[in-house]
């Protein structure tokens, strides 16, 4: 599984070469960001049997066009970026978000800021 932000440095961090080095019949899961995985290379790897399948909550091109290989392969599951929509969102994430909004309204950086280095640019 992938758990990283998308940057220009890691775009297509999983491409044909990386997939070729994976164990045969592995399953790739991406819930992070579209663009981390080369969707064309992934579709080809699943179609060829190199990978058993994939679970994608994000893809490079959203929305995918009808008939796209990621949508037509039965061994690939694509969800509309709702993989994080679990039952605890109301109990954990919403209060965290509310606290960050109050912090920002007071003129401070949110506690959970992940890109602080870019805020002063």
Regions found by a protein language model. Give the residues of each.
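Rossmann-like adenosine-cofactor binding region
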Residues: 1-69
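C-terminal helix-to-coil terminal segments
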Residues: 60-121
């Amino acid at each position: 599984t992938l758990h990283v932000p998308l940057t220009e440095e890691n775009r297509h961090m999983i491409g044909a070469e990386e997939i070729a080095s994976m164990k045969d019949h592995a399953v790739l899961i991406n819930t992070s960001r579209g663009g981390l995985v080369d969707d064309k290379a992934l579709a080809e790897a699943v179609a060829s049997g190199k990978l058993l399948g994939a679970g994608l909550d994000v893809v490079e091109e959203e929305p995918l066009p009808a008939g796209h290989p990621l949508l037509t392969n039965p061994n690939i599951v694509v969800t509309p970026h709702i993989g994080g929509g679990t039952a605890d969102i109301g109990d954990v994430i919403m209060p965290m978000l509310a606290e960050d909004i109050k912090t920002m309204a007071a003129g401070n950086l949110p506690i959970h800021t992940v890109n602080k280095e870019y805020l002063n640019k």
